[in-house]
Amino acid sequence: MEDNPYGELRFEGEIQPSLKSMDTKGLVMFLGTFSKVFCPGLRLGWVAADKDVLSEFIKIKQSADLHTSNFDQGVADAYMDAYDLDAHVAKICDLYRHRRDLILQVMEEELPAGCTWTHPEGGLFLWLSMPEGVSARKVFNKCIEM
């Protein structure tokens, strides 16, 4: 199972190939979502899988919640008919790139010596490592104050 909610939110470098794109035996289920690129409150996703796997997945999904909201599906369908989703994704990638650059700048200026972090090329997260003796709770509380 490949869960890829942030795959389209790439703002640097090449888009990484999915495991599904390399799957020659039909073993990978690819899970995507509209909530990260379209509307956070719209809990609507999609699955790409082998036909036999998908039919079993549908049974499991139906036993879990009967069906996905028809209204939510209609909203997503109407949006994709009326607007260019790729252009929208490009726009939000620019926004997230700007936010990433800003947080990296603030971290460089404000965090204590010895802290290290990743430089994300996409998505919404980064990984911060702090030196021994630095309280993660105190850093967290300081961030909340800002």
PLM feature segments, named:
Residues 1-146:
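PLP-dependent class I/II
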